[in-house]
Amino acid sequence: MPALNRIVADRTRLDDADITWLEDLVDDWQMLADTSFSDLILWVPDRDPNVFWAVAQVRPDTGPTALEDDVVGESVAYDDESLVTEAFMSAEMCETSDNKLSAGIPVDIWAIPVVRRGEVIAVVERHTNQMGVRAPGNTEDNYLEIADILSEMLHHGRFPQFPGSDRALAPKVTDGVIRVAATGMITFASPNALSAFRRLGLAGDLDGEYLIPTVRELCPRLREVGQSLTLDLEGRWLTETDIENSDATCLLYTSDAADDSL
């Protein structure tokens, strides 16, 4: 992340711990981009509190971009109508739903302050291309609910959950998503997640089933390869877990969301 490191070092007052936190956020934020169907921009404050710098940007794999250009390296000056300014000054999430036009495209924008140790250290903007928003459905509704949970976690310093983890080979939202309630019951499984479990031998659906017993039934030898299945799949940590049998191998990436497991 040369742009992030260079701009933060040259232009901001952020300390090493904050810089590391933002680097970990950028490593993990594709999940937020994909579940919100949004482009994300990370803005950091200049030493001059009236200026903000774009240090990272990501586009969604689940929908069309809302931003034609790469804005990394650009700066914005103080504007009392700017969502970045409003979010930074208020430490509260801000949004506009008036379909602001960007290159002729109606775009909804959220600004999420990144709060650590009681202070706002950055702002993440979510830009959603409204022309590309998919028709409402079970998958879309669950993705947006997950995005709202992740946004709240980001706002309150709980996302990323496991700083320093290597996400390079981790599954993506497009590979499949499963939501698990605190009881362990599956409340939603995306089509690709269901397909992955079908390759493991699942005959029915996942909705309404309990994740841990289902995995143990499909992969009875799992304990013999040293997997701490219960702790991992209950989502108490952000971690990766291989589940496998003679038919297939799946990699699960689990995340604990305070009020609703992802």
List the predicted regions and their residue ranges.
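Regulatory loop-to-helix N-cap segments in sensory/regulatory domains
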Residues: 130-140
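Short beta-strand-to-loop transition segments that serve as allosteric relay/switch motifs
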Residues: 124-132, 255
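Conserved small/polar residues in nucleotide/adenosyl-binding loops
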Residues: 253-260
